[in-house]
Amino acid sequence: MANRPLDILNNALDTPVIVRLKGAREFRGELKGYDIHMNLVLDNAEELREGEVVSKFGSVVIRGDNVVYVSP
């Protein structure tokens, strides 16, 4: 049973997630990796504004202290 945040991230590996950042930025992509600081690696990442895609990226690394939430 996944009770800790890192357990939930582990269960979300290789699946699409939405990541909300400080400053109202949002990314959607496939979670490929993370560490204990909640630094995240997303593949096929897209930046969203108001639910619309504004930029597409191959892979992105998101610094954990900017993450507000991760939605699997």
UniProtKB/Swiss-Prot annotation:
InterPro entries xref list: Lsm7/SmG-like, LSM_dom_sf, Sm, Sm_dom_euk/arc, snRNP_Sm-like_arc
SUPFAM superfamilies named in the record: Sm-like ribonucleoproteins
Cellular component GO terms held in the UniProt record: ribonucleoprotein complex
Residues of the Sm domain: 4-72
UniProt GO MF annotations: RNA binding
Residues of the signal peptide: none
Highest rank taxon of the organism: Archaea
Entry keywords, A to Z: Ribonucleoprotein
UniProt record similarity statement: Belongs to the snRNP Sm proteins family.
HAMAP family (alphabetical): Lsm_RuxX
Name this polypeptide is given: Putative snRNP Sm-like protein
Annotated source species: Methanosarcina barkeri (strain Fusaro / DSM 804)
Lineage: Archaea, Methanobacteriati, Methanobacteriota, Stenosarchaea group, Methanomicrobia
